[in-house]
Each structure stands twice: as C-alpha cells, then as structure tokens.
Amino acid sequence: MNPDTAEMAIPLLREQPAAEAPPAAARRRDTKSPSARALARLSAPLARVRADPWRIAAVADSWRALWSSRLLVWAAGAGTVLAFGFGPARKAFNPPGVTRGFGAIGNLLAAPAARWDSAWYLVIAHYGYRPDLGRFTIARTAFFPLYPLGIRAISWLGSPPVLAGVLLSLAALALALYGIHRLAALELSSLDAARAAVFVTAFAPMAFFFSAVYSESLYLALSVGLFWSARHGRWALVGVLGALATATRSTGLVLLVPALALYLYGPRLDRPPDRPRAGAAGPPRAMAPRYRLRADALWLALVPAAAAVFGAWLALGGGDGLAPFRSQQIWGRHFAGPYVAVWQGLGAAFEGARQLLSFQHAHVYYPAATGSPTVAASHNLMLFAFLLAAIPALVLAARRLPRAYVLYVLAALALPLSYPVAGQPLMSLPRFLLVLFPLHLAAGSWLAEHPRARRPLLGASAALMVVFLAQFATWHWVA
C-alpha cells in the first residue's frame, strides 16, 4: 500500500455503505412520536458502541481497571489509617471542614483522597483567588481554576466538597481509561496492548492520585481526548480540549507542541497529506510539513489563550496577572537550565545513598536537603528511580508511536526538569510522569508482547501503589 494513503486506510475500511434514503411513501408512514424519535437519537451512541467490538472492549476493560484499582486504593488507604492512625498533624494542610471534620467514618474514607494539595483545591473551590486572603494568595495561583470550578459546580448540587472532588476525579479517570484504550488500539492495532495500557495506567505506583482531590485525572482525560481528536482532524475540539487542559494545569500549555506536530506532520485520519513522505531525501525535505496550514489551525490558539484569560481574570480582580508563573518561586522552583534537574537529581540520589549508608543523623552528604536526613535521602533516591524507569518507556514510545507523542513527553518533562527545587531537584516528578500517557501506551505494547511478565509487573506496580498510598493517607509527603 502506498504509505501516503495508508493513513486513510483504516477509516475507509471500517466505513459501511450508506443506506439508501427511504421513499417518500415510507417517510409518510413513519408514525413515531416526537418523544420516541428523541429517544432514538439519544440511544444512537449506545447502539454504535454495541456494534463496534473495539468500543465494547474499551468499555469492558476500562471499567474493570477502574473498579478493581479504586477498590484497592480505598481498602488499602482505610486499612492503613485503621492500623496506624492518621499520622502526624499538618495544620496548614489539614484545616477542619476541608480535609477532616466529617466524623469517624467520613474522615476514614477521606484519608486516601484528601491530603496535601487537596486542601488548596478545596479552599480555592470555596474562596477562589481573592487577593485579600493574605500571603498565600500568590501561592494559590499555582493551582489552575478548572478543577476547583468543577468541585464547586458539583457542590452546588448538594455534595460535600471532598466528595465532589472525588466524584469529579473518578468520572475523569473513567473517561481517561476509555480514551487510552481507544488511542492504544488505534496506534498499536492490538487489543492486548490497549488492555495492558489501561491496567498500567490504573495500577501505576502513583495512580492513587487519580481518585484523590487532585487534578491529575481531569488533566489526563483532557490530554488523551486532545490526541484522539487531533488524530481524527477535529481541530475545533482540539482547541477546546487544549484550552480546558491549560485551565487545569500550567503544563497544559505544552499540549500545543504535539497538536502542531500532528497538524503539520501527521499521521492524520481526516485527509491525505499534501506532500509525500520525505523518504531518503535528506534533512531539509524531512523537516518540510506534510500538511499545509489551513484556517482550522487557528483553533489551536485557544490553548495559550486559556492561560492568558486566567491571568487577565486575576488582574481584573485586583491580583497579579503573572502570579500563576511567579508562584513557582514561592514553591521553591527556579530556572536552572534545560533539563539540568536530571544531573542534579543524579547528584542528590548519589549523596542520598551515601547518607543512608553512613547511618548519620545529620545532613552530612547533602546539606541542601531539609527535614529528616533519612527521609530526604530516601525521597531523592525514589525520585531518581522514577526518572530511570521512564527512560526505557520513552525509548519504546519513540519506536512504536508517532513522533508527536514523544515530543509531548519531552516538552512536558522540560518543565520539572528545568525548574528544580533545591532540596529535591526532582520533586513531584512521579506525578508529572503519571499523566504522560504515551509512556503507558509504550509499556502496554511491551506487556502485550511479553504476557508472562504482565502479572508480575502489574502486581509489583500495584504493591508500590499501596506502599505510597499508605504514606499519603497518613500525611507523609510522597510526590
């Protein structure tokens, strides 16, 4: 098959011949009531799902991964609290009525879901970004508004804010798992790989954040939807989803990179390329876009526009329009150069190992760290281990997925790896990696080819999730 037309083959092969329009007499005999016709239109999407085995598999696999992983999360979180208590008090992050104060059972159920940054989202959902709330106003703007707005909207229906946040996260996770399955099936042409990718996502070591009052699941659902829409050439939807992702997290801005890459270079299913593949014609020809810019590319401007609207809204309210970006300094992040945190993280991990092996009770080998020397050293080793684990997945993604996926991972990692924190250069890296679904797709493709490794690796990943969740539920910092 001609490679220039191969991208159009899948949708063309799946198309069914259009049914002929019924004759006028038959149309006159249609005696369905308006309510029956409306019901038929509403049930059409469900009928399409039932008619497509790929969609049926996506629904079944994503649902199984969702309920089994979340059951493990709540059982492990509640069990940890029952066994060890709620852990050390963190008054600044544990205000009454926000993450606690719901009675014995309510506090127990909130333990796996409402910790640390959850308080920021819940406070924003209630108070917004009012500039009269003291010194924490700028720090609050690091948390973008869409997720707390969702919490507030659900709370209007009568739900407590913590429950509203959990429901929002679970709904977004369900959509994200379904989208990952569909996207993996499209890119890898394998139901086994799609199923494995879904379970890799649901049982990742930090996947308990997906059902916590955190924005990870919402951002994941929006970014997966953006890629699916871009592959199918729905550029208005790409712009809207990109804007919503940017309104969820500042890293949503980097989604403009893969969106542009898919627009200009493909692969795309909406139309054939305007130029043939470069082949062996050399670098200049290889860099030439395969698709010409058209008016629909303007939809991509919605992605950066969302960040501008957020800044303008803060400024109109009497705040600082650049506060969302200046707030990174308050959180200890500073620009040190592109990907400099990789080298700094290696140094912190090495010194952390020396610290642990020295059995010293003071910061002997890494004085930049704060708090317990043992805890700080262990964290730096753990963070660097996550970085090392991401490397083979990134290499595999570069071999098996379109280039736009790899560009997305590299662009998204440029933010945490270029803005390190002094005591922990790779702080929060596991959460940044958690939402980079191309790594999950790559891992799923590998597990599909090595079925004997599937259960041991997924079991080990689930065990790590339980360990990290136990720390999170008892107010120990994880990521």
Walk through the language-model features, giving the residues of each.
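Specific aromatic-rich, kink-prone transmembrane helix
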Residues: 179-182, 200-203, 218-237, 256-259, ...
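Transmembrane-helix signature of polytopic, membrane-embedded enzymes
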Residues: 160-164, 180-203, 220-221, 237, ...
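Short acidic/glycine- and proline-prone juxtamembrane loop motifs at membrane-interface regions
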Residues: 211-218, 429
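Membrane-lumen/periplasm interface segments of specific transmembrane helices
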Residues: 72-90, 113, 256-389, 404-409
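Loop-to-helix entry region of an early transmembrane alpha helix in multi-pass inner-membrane enzymes
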Residues: 137-145, 149, 157-175, 374-384
